[in-house]
């Protein structure tokens, strides 16, 4: 069979499979428009490739694709030439969203879906290019090493770093452990004090507590009610024996962005190292390690639509920062992290980083627009409030308190929306969020808070669906609550002394 005949047969088969999937959804939901809207999600992210990758796939500018022009993304019709790339699995996945079998995803702080462009870049390294990147005696190793170094360059360019300053790890948790423990142990003969913040990620807090058990002193700075630190308190906390200050870029629960540039200036003046956990900020907001005087940084791939299981530590070379390695072995990654790299993961990370850099302004504008729509809709519900600073924040993380409602009950009632009441790393605990407690929220308000994540593939239809369903569920739960009856009668609950919770 000729190449053209084979292509036509393949396209016909895909169209037949898509038609079957759409028939299944029509029978279940009787609403083809919803299916087209749901498929629009895949149309933007998967069926239509980036102009930089495959110009022939789409001639529409990203502004229109993300709803930044006259047409919103959910209203965009499916291009005819895109149907040939839709598989049955993709169609059924999209279809299952509108039939209630697969919830809408709004937990982007926990993880993000793998961008299909990232997957495409990874596939050759599972079977075809399978060499060990550390094998330097044959072509298989050279080819894998070249791919790894290209990815290292792409990852470094996002934060204006030297590629030699990027050390690959298994993720941000390992990077935080390696950096904090490594820098403290290397300089312990001269400096035994570190400074951090009460609202840091749990892996940072636990790493610092482990160092306390080794004899180090740690100062945990409080935050203001908006979630930001007081720079004067930071300046006063730094001592002559302080080795490192660790402040996260974007908080994973309330989305506040700390003033990295101002913190970096203080640390440089005081001659202490500045570390930032940027897992939630890398590739999403502008971060320049040189302009901000950042010496150490932790980043992760799966927060930026890359694969899970791969991350990196940025370690400045000039002025040089020394670390005592956590993992010993073959001396890979300049002796700081031994172990064979997985080229497929590294390449996926590099592709995700490149896409984030190229499309950051489009993603940020798209997410900001949807974030404001979500906030306006949810704050229209009585007795609700936004947690964290309303201006200095990443718009993709929206944390709302719904007074007189238990957050766990609200989550259980929203089965068609994938949400979280806080960090995925502590979601198994029923204790109130330590981040919300740190900004002054009561136990009751902390328990009533929900975190909404907005990402690259979120649509206006999903935002409106979330607003409608959250409003309905909050009203339902409040009508069941005796506390709500007291509030409706004008009783100030803060004046009541409860014998038990």
UniProtKB/Swiss-Prot annotation:
Keyword Zinc (UniProt): no
Active site: 425
Claim: ATP-binding is one of the keywords in the record: no
Single Gene Ontology BP annotation: tRNA wobble position uridine thiolation
Modification N6-(pyridoxal phosphate)lysine, positions: 303
Any one of the GO CC terms: cytosol
Entry-linked NCBIfam families: IscS, PRK14012.1
Name of the protein described by the UniProt record: Probable cysteine desulfurase, mitochondrial
Lineage: Eukaryota, Fungi, Dikarya, Ascomycota, Taphrinomycotina
